[in-house]
Amino acid sequence: VEPKRYSALLVIFLKDLQPLGGLVKKVLEKKPESFEAYDDQTLKLALRFLPDFVKLLGAKNMISLAFQFLPEMKMLLFGGLPKLILLAEFTGDSEKEVGAKAKEAQEHIREFALRSRVTKNKREVEKYFSIRRQSFKLLHGHAKGLFAAPFVDDVVVKPEHLPEFLPRIRALMVPYQKQKKLIYTIAGHAGDGNFHVIPLMDLSKSSVRAVI
């Protein structure tokens, strides 16, 4: 199957996970090509190491790309970051077509009264996907002495149970992060409830190994 040439994203910012189950169902009614998600830990990494993240994107105009992160920086400074960012991708044969699909989906979820936006161009699409897909590489590059410890299996949870599941998995991980025994991110595919929990740890320390 030949992939469509154009794509646009409906980006949804969730500060409260309670609507997540119904929201996922509603978005899927518009048949997005993909429906991904990442947590606030992932977004914090991109903002914390913004210059290096921009380099990962291979951008020629670094200043221009950095300015694209102003909305996220404002959220961090004034309103706090969302707990989950959802990316619903719509593809088609023209920019006009994909933009219309994404805006139609945005209107379709208006009842949830959530903050959302539709990407305007290819660069914006790449920005959001890169946060999702390059975060582990970014984290690994800055977490000296820490290595991937995939002791948490990928999980598949029905979308309607995600508002209960995600806070519970975070509650398990956060105490160890505060003790500086691990760093973690959560990302995955909201449409089918498949999520990846990626911890980085220094397994040379017995106290850290005991966490596992």
Q: In which residue ranges do the predicted regions lie?
A:
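Noncatalytic alpha-helical scaffold of FAD-dependent oxidoreductases
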Residues: V1-I212
